[in-house]
Amino acid sequence: MPRSFLVKKHFNASKKPNYSELDTHTVIISPYLYESYPIPVIPKPEILTSGAYSPITVWTSSAAPLHSPLPSGLSPLTGYSSSLGRVSPPPSSDTSSKDHSGSESPISDEEERLQPKLSDPHAIEAEKFQCNLCNKTYSTFSGLAKHKQLHCDAQSRKSFSCKYCDKEYVSLGALKMHIRTHTLPCVCKICGKAFSRPWLLQGHIRTHTGEKPFSCPHCNRAFADRSNLRAHLQTHSDVKKYQCKNCSKTFSRMSLLHKHEESGCCVAH
């Protein structure tokens, strides 16, 4: 019976065939496994002669055609290869000649904008911060601001004038503190006396209430103001702050020194 008329058996893909039960060890797996079609048998490769094989051809650049035919409706794509993916085209002869001649390659507008202009000294000088009063230049804005605040002679001559008197001040804060001596915004509610500072008003109110929170640690005296206590502590110290030039006596207060000088200082002979 010919092999082409063999009866097809149900094939199980998960089960390995038993080659000992077959007439030939060649197993044919075809995508069309139907009972109505016979399965052809391919002969063994040993029966093929050496002349059936084509000789091995070596691919060289000389053997490649200059222009391969393309189907109609398709245009050739430059810079691409069918097997190796994208291949960058070789540089043209004009570009290579310019590079070897020493001329610069073209630069895009974005690269030219981002490239630092180090060759232009005027551009570097323009980036410095210059004082408009004394023409001094600084590399940072903070250095220029510090110069204007402290070291610039022209800036130090700028002053703020008081509208109530002829006094002038360098800073605006000092002028505002001086204006309080004219306006006297702190007013006593008991007697109507006005003061320029709130702590001066607080010390004045203690004269009405009789409160003396600052007491001397050496004696029983107490004071309403801290400055009066500091002046009193000079009486207990061995070295007084104010000294007479004639008799070298020392006093705790300037007022006591003035009384001593007005009474007639006795010069020691």
Curated annotation (Swiss-Prot):
Chain segments carrying region Disordered: 81-117
PROSITE patterns membership: ZINC_FINGER_C2H2_1, ZINC_FINGER_C2H2_2
Principal location: nucleus
Segments of this protein annotated with the region SNAG domain: 1-20
GO BP terms, alphabetized: cartilage morphogenesis; cell migration involved in endocardial cushion formation; cellular response to epidermal growth factor stimulus; cellular response to ionizing radiation; cellular response to platelet-derived growth factor stimulus; chromatin organization; desmosome disassembly; endothelial cell migration
Claim: Repeat is one of the keywords in the record: yes
Post-translational modification: Phosphorylated by GSK3B. Once phosphorylated, it becomes a target for ubiquitination.
Molecular function as annotated in GO: chromatin binding; DNA-binding transcription factor activity, RNA polymerase II-specific; DNA-binding transcription repressor activity, RNA polymerase II-specific; E-box binding; zinc ion binding
CC per GO annotation: chromatin; cytoplasm; cytosol; nucleoplasm; nucleus
Swiss-Prot/TrEMBL keywords: Cytoplasm, Developmental protein, DNA-binding, Metal-binding, Nucleus, Repeat, Repressor, Transcription, Transcription regulation, Ubl conjugation, Zinc, Zinc-finger
Zinc finger (C2H2-type) boundaries: 129-151, 160-182, 186-208, 214-236, 242-265
Domain commentary: Repression activity depends on the C-terminal DNA-binding zinc fingers and on the N-terminal repression domain.
Subunit comment: Interacts (via SNAG domain) with LIMD1 (via LIM domains), WTIP (via LIM domains) and AJUBA (via LIM domains). Interacts (via zinc fingers) with KPNA2, KPNB1, and TNPO1. May interact (via zinc fingers) with IPO7.
UniProt family annotation: Belongs to the snail C2H2-type zinc-finger protein family.
Cross-referenced PANTHER family: ZINC FINGER PROTEIN, ZINC FINGER PROTEIN SNAI2
Role, per record: Transcriptional repressor that modulates both activator-dependent and basal transcription. Involved in the generation and migration of neural crest cells. Plays a role in mediating RAF1-induced transcriptional repression of the TJ protein, occludin (OCLN) and subsequent oncogenic transformation of epithelial cells. Represses BRCA2 expression by binding to its E2-box-containing silencer and recruiting CTBP1 and HDAC1 in breast cells. In epidermal keratinocytes, binds to the E-box in ITGA3 promoter and represses its transcription.
Name assigned to this protein: Zinc finger protein SNAI2
Species classification: Eukaryota, Metazoa, Chordata, Craniata, Vertebrata
